[in-house]
Amino acid sequence: MTGFFTILSFSLAALSVTNAAQILSVPKGAEVVPNGYIVVMKDDTSQQDFSSHRVWISSIHHNMTRRGLDGAGVKQTYDFDHLRGYSGIFDEDTIKDISNDPKVAFVEPDAIISQHVVVQQRKAPWGLSRLSNRRGGRNYVFDSSAGSGVWAYVVDSGVDVRHSEFQGRAVWGSNLVDNKNSDGTGHGTHVAGTIAGKTYGIAKNAKVVAVKVLNSEGKGPTSGIIAGINWSIRHARKHGMLQKSVLNMSLGGTYSAGLNHATAQAIKAGMFVSVSAGNDNINSNGNSPASERSVCTIAASTENDGKASFSNWGPAVDLYAPGHNILSARPGGGSQTMSGTSMAAPHAAGVAAYLIAKEGIPGNRACLRLKQLSQPTIRNPGPDTTSRLLYNGSGR
């Protein structure tokens, strides 16, 4: 697997030439894949033009290898309905040539994305009861449909699909980061348990599809996240499930135009997408995919309906959801408690799956429905931030 490193000062603006595609920069200190780039084509690029461009890229692969750039060339190809592009390892001369192609919209460094979990401790769950009661309570109130016929794509660190919480409803989908079809951090299994676990889950009858994009350190390249989204869309389309699917990404990193564009493609295709706002107590506008306006960006609330101290905020946030001391599944059996906006986002994904099954709404309309049902109960949500808390519409 390609190694990661942290750059102290990085700007590619100097590579740009007149009439060339923009080569975006990343903030100081951002962790990136060495010589890794994401290339996005212009919207009007035809399939034939894209194929011709890829043939040209293949022709210069040999030259890069001769210049001593190990593992050079295209690693992932993206072919969304309204976005075409690819990622790979390229030297500066090659990136300059790529940016000069009039079919290229922009190029950006392949930054590292991380999961949004902050602490683990043992405490009782409370999130399920809170999202089904306007004023709080001890019981989780829900319709027995419970997400039946809905698929939940967990784009994360993997899922222990054999965990008893999933009752055989979890399957392995794709691995875009390593060769280990397991959950090395427990993060993805916890997230999946909140969405669809029999005990800790909201949509207790939904199917879970594991899409691994984060390694055992909870990190992965942006290019792999985009590939995971691309795979999920294709898989849901193949099975006729686009409008009956939710996609959760409890992860994030520095702003990425490519990742935001790719995330938007899932909504355009018909899916519901929930993402975590981030855990730095800052405006989430600078993070991706949280800053993508078409997704459902979720901040974390506490047991007393306050903003969790770590939670990001800002106008990109669509809703608050329980994200502090959340009990859910652990790989190998059993359970564990975690906190973070990573725990808040799957609450939204679970309620979206629940409503898709119960009300028959298409996935890409579910975020609007969540906001319609939500309650304005969060105290001190942050500047220019909604105070609305997730609610499943149970009537309680």
Swiss-Prot record:
CDD domains: Peptidases_S8_PCSK9_ProteinaseK_like (cd04077). It holds the Pfam family Inhibitor_I9. PROSITE patterns: SUBTILASE, SUBTILASE_ASP, SUBTILASE_HIS, SUBTILASE_SER. The keyword Mitochondrion does not apply. One of its GO terms (biological process) is proteolysis. It is found in: Secreted. It is an enzyme of class 3 (hydrolase). Glycans are attached at residues 230, 248, 392. Keywords: Glycoprotein, Hydrolase, Protease, Secreted, Serine protease, Signal, Virulence, Zymogen. GO terms for molecular function: serine-type endopeptidase activity. Residues 21-116 form a propeptide. Disulfide bonds: none annotated. Belongs to the peptidase S8 family. Secreted subtilisin-like serine protease with keratinolytic activity that contributes to pathogenicity. This is Subtilisin-like protease 5.
